[in-house]
């Protein structure tokens, strides 16, 4: 490990926000965490075994009635589906929408904000999203220890903290050598899709990603399959432009 890499491991890329939750979010977290959250571990986890197995029931009977046309049947037997990771899903609305539209893919959302986790847990349970799981931990630790190199079909990083002050730029997620770790996790042909409303961050992130070995910029604008996030709608209401960055692993 280089000295720069060692220093980076000690710097958090996220703000420690309050874990205050509503009563509903607390209930959902208490009842559903064991069903849909994968505990953090210091070894590579077998994602195929997780996603190809049924989630053990843990919610009170009748608390989350199945939506029309869906049942609480076990997840079907399956071959390992391509795995897509989202770092920092916020309140999880876009995450759930993407997973619902792509049942042939496996999705893993990584977040430390417990209120958002509670809300996404409810969406997963209510919509029976067997192809979506959560890890509650620092995403960089997860990528270092739980995700084997060249595993991921995609990485979603939607509206990461821009850390606008110059002295805080070293905390940015899209900053080398952190981007090297992101690229390492991607399988050949996998993609990294980042979105921000901070123009200076978009420019610098594009430069950092372009300098990252094995990543190639694929500029095509917004992907039509990405739903708008709550943060994005707020940014657009305030007149801020949205910047899309899409890179492919060679």
UniProtKB/Swiss-Prot annotation:
Residues where S-adenosyl-L-methionine binds: 86, 111, 138, 161
Enzyme Commission designation: 2.1.1.33
Active site: 161
Swiss-Prot/TrEMBL catalytic activity: guanosine(46) in tRNA + S-adenosyl-L-methionine = N(7)-methylguanosine(46) in tRNA + S-adenosyl-L-homocysteine
Keywords, ordered alphabetically: Methyltransferase, S-adenosyl-L-methionine, Transferase, tRNA processing
Pfam families: Methyltransf_4 (PF02390)
CDD domains (UniProt xref): AdoMet_MTases
Superkingdom per UniProt: Bacteria
PANTHER family according to UniProt: 3-DEOXY-D-MANNO-OCTULOSONIC-ACID TRANSFERASE/TRNA GUANINE-N 7 - -METHYLTRANSFERASE, PENTACOTRIPEPTIDE-REPEAT REGION OF PRORP DOMAIN-CONTAINING PROTEIN
Role description: Catalyzes the formation of N(7)-methylguanine at position 46 (m7G46) in tRNA.
Name of the protein: tRNA (guanine-N(7)-)-methyltransferase
Organism this protein belongs to: Treponema pallidum (strain Nichols)
Organismal lineage: Bacteria, Pseudomonadati, Spirochaetota, Spirochaetia, Spirochaetales
Name of encoding gene: trmB
